Amino acid sequence: MKNIINLVIFSGYWPIAGNFGLNTNLLETNLINLSVVVGLLVYFGKGVLNNLLSNRKQTILSTIKDAEERYNEATDKLNQARERLERAKVKADEIRVNGLSQIEREKKELINAADEDSKRLEDSKNATIRFEEQRAIEQVRQQVSRLALERALEALNKRLNSELHSRVIDYHIGLLRAMESTSD
């Protein structure tokens, strides 16, 4: 910082600084000195400049190469992800189709099972009805037989008196004698 301040202070004492312009005289401009300085800069600075440019070029090329590699890797990963996505879509479609067919199959099985249960219940109901009909018929037969027997006994008791009783006995005795005489 002190150097810069000193330079500014001392520059005020320079007489050239006050008169700045373009000098067109070649001999006064010292073109040869400038050419020598530029030539030396080119000759000695060429290696350094070439090294700097070469290093910069290598850095840029390696950066481009890395970017291309990352791009290729990203492209590969994207393609792999797309393939996985397609496989997942196919798998999802298969699962959906299998699910729908499974639902249809289970629906048919449930309908068949319900039909079988309904048929079994209908058969059981019909068997129960037939059994109850048979039981009712049997009860009616027994009741009719009992009533017929009671009426027959009542009728016999009303008609059967001692005279009829004697005649029936005599008749049967006569039949037994007739059978006995034919068998001799």
From Swiss-Prot:
Keywords of the record: ATP synthesis, CF(0), Chloroplast, Hydrogen ion transport, Ion transport, Membrane, Plastid, Thylakoid, Transmembrane, Transmembrane helix, Transport
Summary of subunit composition and partner proteins: F-type ATPases have 2 components, F(1) - the catalytic core - and F(0) - the membrane proton channel. F(1) has five subunits: alpha(3), beta(3), gamma(1), delta(1), epsilon(1). F(0) has four main subunits: a(1), b(1), b'(1) and c(10-14). The alpha and beta chains form an alternating ring which encloses part of the gamma chain. F(1) is attached to F(0) by a central stalk formed by the gamma and epsilon chains, while a peripheral stalk is formed by the delta, b and b' chains.
Family, similarity comment: Belongs to the ATPase B chain family.
Role summary: F(1)F(0) ATP synthase produces ATP from ADP in the presence of a proton or sodium gradient. F-type ATPases consist of two structural domains, F(1) containing the extramembraneous catalytic core and F(0) containing the membrane proton channel, linked together by a central stalk and a peripheral stalk. During catalysis, ATP synthesis in the catalytic domain of F(1) is coupled via a rotary mechanism of the central stalk subunits to proton translocation.
Residue intervals passing through the bilayer: 4-24
Xref: InterPro entries: ATP_synth_b/b'su_bac/chlpt
Entry-linked PANTHER family: ATP SYNTHASE SUBUNIT B, CHLOROPLASTIC
Molecular function as annotated in GO: proton-transporting ATP synthase activity, rotational mechanism
GO cellular component, one term: chloroplast thylakoid membrane
Subcellular location as annotated: Plastid, Chloroplast thylakoid membrane
Official protein name in the record: ATP synthase subunit b, chloroplastic
Location, primary (coarse class): plastid
Something else known: In plastids the F-type ATPase is also known as CF(1)CF(0).
N-terminal signal peptide: none
Any matching Pfam family: ATP-synt_B
Presence of keyword Cytoplasm: no
Keyword Plastid on entry: yes
Membrane topology: Single-pass membrane protein
